[in-house]
Regions:
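Single conserved hydrophobic/aromatic residue that forms the stacking wall/gate
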Residues: 1-9
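Glycine-rich phosphate- or other oxyanion-binding loops that anchor nucleotides, phosphorylated ligands
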Residues: 37-188
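Short Gly/aromatic-enriched secondary-structure transition segments
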Residues: 29-34
Length: 188
């Protein structure tokens, strides 16, 4: 897959949806968009936005598959990633359809531990964060900024009564609300 992309991608900026079907929809907004690669859950289009080369690559769901995509994209020259997709609101002010711009993440998953000690915080690039906030404002979207909670299980915290560790899940969920986490997701 990487060899397919290396011949065609030299873009610093990559938008990362989870669902491969979202790639074509995002690429419709590019000038000169074309399909570069399609293998398993990884689909890549490249093109231009406002004269800047940009790509979109799907990652599948969760940290392990996202890390595969990002590792290969870094080898192709990418250095700025914008993850787009679905999250669940933790903060009751976050409503369906709102934008959440993550400034950092609680690392409750396993993948990031392969890259940095758990004590090291997962924080977003300030310039990229500010650009996403400015774009949300310009487009009139309701947005929230703050820390998100990243996890490995899609259903665990959303259906805790079904889980053997329901007590722990419920208590942690309340803790994330109290400390101000905005949303829960699986790829940050």
């Amino acid at each position: 897959y990487r060899r397919q992309r290396q011949m065609c991608i030299r873009d610093s900026y990559v938008i990362l949806p989870g669902d491969p079907k979202r790639c074509a929809k995002i690429a419709e907004h590019f000038d000169n968009a074309h399909l570069v690669a399609d293998s398993r859950e990884f689909v890549t289009y490249t093109g231009e936005l406002d004269g800047v080369k940009v790509s979109v690559t799907s990652t599948g769901i969760g940290g392990p598959s996202a890390s595969i995509a990002m590792e290969e994209l870094v080898l192709c020259g990418a250095d700025t990633f914008i993850r787009v997709g679905t999250c669940g609101g933790i903060d009751l002010d976050v409503k369906g359809g709102d934008i959440v711009v993550a400034t950092g993440a609680v690392r409750m998953e396993g993948t990031s531990k392969e890259y940095a000690p758990i004590e090291y915080p997962a924080v977003a690039d300030l310039d990229t964060t500010n650009a996403l906030v400015a774009a949300s404002r310009k487009l009139g979207y309701t947005y929230h900024t703050g820390v998100v909670q990243c996890k490995d299980a899609f259903y665990g915290q959303h259906e805790p009564e079904r889980m053997p560790v329901s007590y722990e899940l419920l208590n942690k969920w309340e803790a994330w609300k109290r400390v101000g986490c905005k949303a829960s997701e699986m790829e940050s």
